[in-house]
Amino acid sequence: MSTLNHVRAPAGDIPSLHWQGGQVDCCVCAHAALRALPGAAGCEPGHACVQDAYARRIDRFFRWHPELGNAHLEHPYFEVRAIAARHADVFRLPAMIDDPDETVRLQLALRLPQAHLVRLADDPHREVRIRVAQRLAPATLATLRTDPDYGVREWVARRLPAALLPLMASDPDWVVRVRVAERIDMPALLRLAGDGEAEVRRVAAARLPASLLVQLIDDPDWRVRWEVACRADPRVLRTLLDDADAEVRAMARERLWPSRPVSSPDDTARPFEGAGHG
């Protein structure tokens, strides 16, 4: 038939296969009539096809025909259901919350209204719960602060109302405590200055009132003392002129005497070397 679309799949692309295996047969497709339509008004096996096993081709089909999303929410192939859920009417999505495939539920977590999104807070798959933590209303977010996955809790710490952050200041994972330290208010921030993880203390040092930095001048990690040198008042800076680390000494000198020329090789600050330094 001369009116059929020609396949535009690039050379060397993944071969077109039916999602159940075997070749794609347009004659048995419910959307066979689309083959006679031009360009994005139609469909193309190997390029934009709802029968294909390749998710990219399914996605292209629904981008060409988003109005067909509702009709495929119960399709037996999970990739079709997941991609159809991106385009379906939102009010149709709550019925899919118990879908057996996490790929589908992940798409739901990106689109569900808040009233239904909370139902995915106990999803068995971490990626779904992470998306929930990224979108859940702050007033409801606290339900995820004790999630077993640190990635979920990290997003909670990024978005939880500041007044509730002290509840996460003792999180067992230091990455979560870093996020808490980036946002928590005094006096709870002061407690994190004594955290067992250096990166948490460093973030706390970058935010503490300058008058309280004196308690960190003997911190065992040079990065924490360097943050102190960046912000402390002159009285504290003078004590850091004899610090064991050249980076810290150089920063203290630079802040005490910003126009003073470098007088010795030891006065030259090395480039910031990160967590592996010394």
Report each predicted region and the residues it spans:
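N-terminal alpha-helical scaffold/docking segments in eukaryotic complex subunits
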Residues: 1-94, 98, 102, 226-278
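Alpha-solenoid HEAT/Armadillo-like helical repeat scaffolds in large eukaryotic proteins
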Residues: 68-76, 94-103, 111, 118-124, ...
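Structured C-terminal portions of repeat-based eukaryotic scaffold domains
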Residues: 209-210, 220-222, 233, 265
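Long, contiguous interaction/recruitment modules in multidomain scaffold/adaptor proteins
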Residues: 19-22, 26-29, 123-124, 129, ...
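Structural detector for internal amphipathic alpha-helices that build alpha-solenoid repeat scaffolds
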Residues: 41-61, 78-90, 95, 103-114, ...
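Repeat-mediated protein-protein interaction surfaces in helical alpha-solenoids
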Residues: 64-68, 138, 162
